[in-house]
């Protein structure tokens, strides 16, 4: 299978390199278009006020296009202009840090997959539930083996399959669960700090309170040690509320 690979952690990130190697070893052809720099939590941002520049990375058996832009830029430019062949599947990841619940709105990883889906491609987002993953080569091999089992024929158009791996050894994973995303939200705060030169700055912190996470949702099952699989479609219409606002019509 021909696969286009991207991420939001950057083209040199360990997660991308791990899944690249695993997909190649599984017999797939992999074309990489990924950001040159760290782009975590940029959401679905698109560069419109400056040109996009591209750097080719070719080292130790790895080859890919590095884009000085966002993950969405990578997909828009890569799938329309850079890649000579259309992929059968787009994979975004493996991200350092889970993308569950409200993370999905902020995630450059999920946004890259979403952009690919909007362009008519089958797309998967892969994430690992640790911001400092060590060796995830075994998880990458597991993901490479899991991807061919997705039954795309039964899924609607522009659907993204969001897959998250727990931060446990592969042999300790309890299984795979298809589940909804949690509706719990981040409780954020900013730490006010002073730099060595006396300047003031702020640093974001946050937590999703465990008691707000409903059982059977992606965050809950991931914490329990399951691989979570959540199909996503980005229609933000609140259908239940449409009729309540009908009085606004003239």
From Swiss-Prot:
Catalyses which reaction(s): a ribonucleoside 5'-phosphate + H2O = a ribonucleoside + phosphate
Family recorded in the similarity comment: Belongs to the SurE nucleotidase family.
Entry's EC annotation: 3.1.3.5
One Pfam family recorded for the sequence: SurE
Molecular functions per Gene Ontology: 5'-nucleotidase activity; metal ion binding; nucleotide binding
Main localisation: cytoplasm
rRNA processing recorded as keyword: no
Stored Gene3D superfamilies: Survival protein SurE-like phosphatase/nucleotidase
Subcellular location(s) of the protein: Cytoplasm
Enzyme superclass (EC): hydrolase
Role according to the record: Nucleotidase that shows phosphatase activity on nucleoside 5'-monophosphates.
Originating gene: surE
Binding positions (a divalent metal cation): 8-9, 40, 95
Cofactor: a divalent metal cation
Record-linked InterPro entries: SurE, SurE-like_Pase/nucleotidase, SurE-like_sf
GO cellular component: cytoplasm
Keyword presence, Nucleotide-binding: yes
Taxonomic superkingdom: Bacteria
Name assigned to this protein: 5'-nucleotidase SurE
Keywords from the UniProt entry: Cytoplasm, Hydrolase, Metal-binding, Nucleotide-binding
Entry note: cofactor: Binds 1 divalent metal cation per subunit.
